[in-house]
Amino acid sequence: MVTIGTLGSHSALNILSGAKDEGFETVLLCEKSRKFYERFRVADEIMYLDSLSEIKREDIQEKLNERDVILVPHGSYISYLDLDFLENEFSVPIFGNKFLFRFESDRELERKWFLKAGMRIPRTFEPETIDRRVIVKYHGAKGGKGYFTVDTPEEYFEKKIEGDVQIQEWIHGVTMYFHYFYSPLQKELELTSIDRRYETTADAVHTFPDREPTYVVVGNFPLVIRESLLEQVFDIGDKVVDASRNLHEKGLIGPFCLETIVTDAPEIVVFEISARIVAGTNFYVPYSPYTYAKYFEPMSAGRRIAREIKMALEEERIKDVVS
């Protein structure tokens, strides 16, 4: 019997509770400092590690493979594990397409994906060509850490930036993060939920108006969108799924998120993608308005993942949903 597992971080409660809903055994790989998971009932087994990177150890991988574990990836896999190792040496099956994680970790590759999809995206700038407000972003899934805004080349160079960054046009509008699920078994795209992020100190700048805002994500707010805009939401989702097959033969599998700004046009401008589950889905356990309207039963993102794994096992197509 397959066991569903994940790393103890990010959206583990969502993932494992959904797996339990579908009748799977569960295992959590967790740092020793995070004892709080014992207070919940989602993990049948907790494997404590000194650090999450220990999942690279051969003996850990062997133990997981002996238990027939399928790991469900989330943002911590992108932040803390080496992508070359994950793609080429890691032997435990990963739900979804791990070969697309590189595209969300490198903003230039991500931009090429969006251009192939034909979506509206922000302009990018070189430091010397900044002529309007821009937001400067580091590569990778770091929850907004280190992002900042500038208006001129002089302001940019004052920051004495270290490391690779992308300079994006600042789009005026509201942020909305659309959570999708693509089923290769049913060849269908679903909208599972929507959120916006609670960021420090951007969401508290009114308290200290003279302080430069930062964008570290500490939580998420649930949202619904005007129903008249749902056509745009599905359109951009379909486009990014279609374009993903040009990047890797399997394309997108399972949950992903398009991070957007909705302008007053109204137009949806896409600025980032996460090619796996995002923490904004955590609010929607056991269901969202959109999953309820489709399934008429509790259906969280975690449960939808487990349902896809269950269907793949029943149809003997598990290779179609893992990498």
Model-derived features: where do they sit?
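Conserved metal-phosphate-binding beta-hairpin within the catalytic cores
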Residues: 244-283
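Active-site nucleotide/adenylate-binding loops and adjacent lid/helix of ATP-dependent enzymes
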Residues: 7, 99-193, 226-238
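ATP-dependent carboxylate/phosphate-activation module, predominantly the ATP-grasp catalytic core
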Residues: 179-244, 274-306
